[in-house]
UniProtKB/Swiss-Prot annotation:
Its EC number is 5.4.2.10. Belongs to the phosphohexose mutase family. GO terms for biological process: carbohydrate metabolic process; peptidoglycan biosynthetic process; UDP-N-acetylglucosamine biosynthetic process. GO terms for molecular function: magnesium ion binding; phosphoglucosamine mutase activity; phosphomannomutase activity. InterPro entries: A-D-PHexomutase_a/b/a-I (IPR005844), A-D-PHexomutase_a/b/a-I/II/III (IPR016055), A-D-PHexomutase_a/b/a-II (IPR005845), A-D-PHexomutase_a/b/a-III (IPR005846), A-D-PHexomutase_C (IPR005843), A-D-PHexomutase_C_sf (IPR036900), A-D-PHexomutase_CS (IPR016066), Alpha-D-phosphohexomutase_SF (IPR005841). This is Phosphoglucosamine mutase. The keyword GTP-binding does not apply. The modification Phosphoserine is found at residue 107. One of its GO terms (cellular component) is cytosol. The keyword Nucleotide-binding does not apply. It holds the Pfam family PGM_PMM_II. Binds 1 Mg(2+) ion per subunit.
């Protein structure tokens, strides 16, 4: 991403009203994208079409209007989707024959943050050439096309139905959820309409929570970042299981019938084992540096190839693509089922897990009996003004890391992650014995603190 002035690896995100997360910048951003798309279309006579989806945070109205005005002024048509999960926008961009898609969301962040991300006509991240052209266009003054070349705006009326049918098509035609009582936590976010409707159409008895957005309650004590809320509701209602999404619907976590949390590592194990038995699994399964060592051991026992990427679903996607794999994810609930969706999709991933359970006649608890997780803990060591990278590379720290890795060899892992944005080193140790894990973590953390002193 070298040379980028405005964009990170996943669009822009931040506090509303500060920096680029402001109405005036987003107005210019819409105009810049419109001009780039008009230029790419050349002289074919058709105005480019851009779809815009958002989550439920109150600032979405402001940014939706700003993007719409900027795009229309540049000569692009706009179709407004309203509240829509991020993966749904990716799917609709790919299948509606439009030129680009935009999501207004800050995912699992609080309501006072927001962000903008883009999809190409293929429903994927913008290519480098388009992104660089967009950056350059932002440095050119706002442009308004001649009146006869201005764009139009409309609402996409059939978007919800299209996406629901896509989700249903990701499971076998005969699959249904009749007789299943489940709790759905929609984080007061983008899935609040679609998810309950879909699961009810499949026959489930749905108990909904986190499905009453008011603009400022997205992710507030609900959703996949507050799984205890879901777990308590499952126990209270004696449900068969619970499903929690995050604010923009690209993450999913679950709770079993006893209210025990089931995270992305657990779900990855369930899917990998089921898909191997079905002959659906191709290539390696991909987790991240933070995937529990118990998952790695379980996959080794099942003779399932397992690779680790850096933390972040985009890195999981990259390693999967390079290795020809179809299944990956991280503990936070970003799951990639690339034979069903091109991006992480919480609803589609949840459906794949439910199909696996139904095919094997198992509950969530039963499906996890072969997975023995090991104690894992991460400590953030703050360094003051010292470079995190330099601290990790210090000889004393490297020696302490080697000692830690030797101490847990064959029983766990020890590793360091310097933050790229703040003076922090993240120290992680896991081992099959909690005392060994804690003692090793204490020694390694102390070495990092001493090196930074």
């Amino acid at each position: 991403m070298g040379g980028r002035k405005y964009f990170g690896t996943d669009g822009i995100r931040g506090r509303v009203g500060q920096g680029v997360i402001s109405a005036d910048f987003v107005l210019r951003l819409g105009n810049a994208l419109g001009r780039v798309l008009v230029a790419q279309r050349g002289q074919d006579g058709r105005r480019p079409i851009v779809i815009i989806g958002k989550d439920t945070r109150i600032s979405g109205y402001m940014f939706e209007a700003a993007l719409e005005a900027g795009l229309v002024a540049a000569g692009a048509d706009v179709q407004l989707l309203g509240p829509m999960p991020t993966p749904a926008v990716a799917f609709l961009t790919r299948t509606l024959g439009v030129d680009a898609g935009i999501v207004i969301s800050a995912s699992h962040n609080p309501h006072y943050d927001n962000g903008i991300k883009f999809f190409s006509a293929q429903g994927e991240k913008l290519d480098d050439a388009t992104e660089l052209a967009l950056e350059a266009a932002l440095d050119v003054p706002f442009t308004t096309a001649e009146s006869e070349k201005l764009g139009k705006a409309s609402r996409a009326r059939e978007a919800v139905g299209r996406y629901i049918e896509f989700c249903k098509a990701s499971v076998p035609r005969a699959f249904d959820l009749r007789g299943v009582r489940l709790v759905l936590d929609c984080a007061h976010g983008a899935t609040y309409q679609i998810a309950p409707l879909l699961f009810r159409e499949l026959g489930a008895e749905v108990i909904g929570i986190g499905a009453e957005p008011n603009g400022v309650n997205i992710n507030a004590g609900v959703g996949s970042t507050h799984i205890d809320n879901l777990a308590a509701k499952v126990r209270e209602t004696r449900a068969d299981l619970g499903i929690a999404f995050d604010g923009d619907g690209d993450r999913v976590l679950m709770a079993d019938d006893q209210g025990n949390p089931v995270d992305g590592d657990d779900l990855l194990y369930i899917l990998a084992r089921a898909w191997k038995d079905e002959g659906r699994l191709r290539g390696p399964v991909v987790g991240t540096l933070m995937s529990n060592y118990g998952v790695e051991k379980a996959f080794a026992d099942l003779q399932i190839p397992f690779l680790r990427s850096n933390v972040g679903d985009r890195y999981v996607h990259q390693v999967l693509t390079e290795g020809g794999g179809v299944l990956g994810g991280e503990a936070s609930g970003h799951l990639l089922c690339l034979d069903r969706a091109t991006t992480g999709d919480g609803i589609v991933s949840a459906l794949q897990v439910l199909v696996a359970l139904r095919n094997n006649g198992q509950t969530l608890r039963q499906a996890l009996k072969g997975l023995v997780r090991v104690p894992q803990k991460t400590v953030n060591v703050r360094l003051g003004n010292v470079s995190a990278k330099a601290t990790v590379q210090a000889g004393s720290v490297q020696s302490a890391l080697a000692d830690a890795q030797h101490a847990v060899a064959g029983r766990g892992r020890a590793f360091l992650r310097p933050s790229g944005t703040e003076p922090v080193v993240r120290v992680t140790v896991e081992a099959d014995d909690a005392t060994l894990m804690q003692e090793t973590l204490d020694r390694l953390s102390a070495a990092v603190r001493e090196a930074a002193a």
